Amino acid sequence: MTKDQQIEAEAAAFRALVEHLQQRTDVQNIDLMNLSGFCRNCLCKWYSAAARKIDPEFEFSEAQQRVYGMSIDEWKRDYQTEASEEQQRRFEETKPQHAKITGY
């Protein structure tokens, strides 16, 4: 596989993951964080950090729009639920394993 083919495959995998998460509006970010250490917000941060290397003027809200398929305000209004005490407790417990992201 050439480097260009690898980049194309990786981009397709990212798009498929984003599309899947856009379809799974029933899955809360806190549950993703608690189970895997990353969530939609992490994807936004990774995307934004990569985009800013290409275009320093890239806005974080553009990454949110791309990952969520809508503005973050729309997502919160339509799909985000209040985290339970158990979810919050688990979030704090698993914090050391959460993704560490810079440059977004």
Residue ranges and their predicted role:
Residues T2-Y104:
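Domain-level signature for proteins that mediate thiol-based redox and metal-cofactor handling
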